[in-house]
Amino acid sequence: MLERPTGVTVLAILYVLAAVFFFLAAAVSGYLAQVASTTQLGEIPYAELFFAFSGIFFSITGTVWLITAYGLWKGRGWGWWLAVIFTAFGLISSLLSLPKGVVGIVVLGAILYYLTRRHVREFFGV
């Protein structure tokens, strides 16, 4: 098996860190859903429901990012595909939010460029 490229290691670690933040956001959303049900925050229409669904969304997203990190770390082809898809979606989102999306375009463009280099694709077998 090929040795994992350093950039792939960095990306996998960044995906894990992002997943941790999503899980933290899920925990905060769950807490806010609880608070909304017992305080004046609950007077805002659908506040409790909003926070509950936000928590579910963040949990699912964190799980998918953690799975992607695993795929990147282990050199699985599906991990590469997930990373490419997420990066492409982020790039499109940044393009749609110009001019404030310039930093995202540069960073995500560089990541997408890196993921499509021959030695990286060979590591993933794609």
UniProtKB/Swiss-Prot annotation:
Its main location: membrane. It is a multi-pass membrane protein. GO terms for cellular component: plasma membrane. Keywords: Cell membrane, Membrane, Transmembrane, Transmembrane helix. It comes from the Archaea. The chain crosses the membrane at residues 13-35, 50-72, 77-96, 101-115. It is found in: Cell membrane. The keyword Cell membrane applies. This is Uncharacterized protein AF_0864. It comes from Archaeoglobus fulgidus (strain ATCC 49558 / DSM 4304 / JCM 9628 / NBRC 100126 / VC-16).
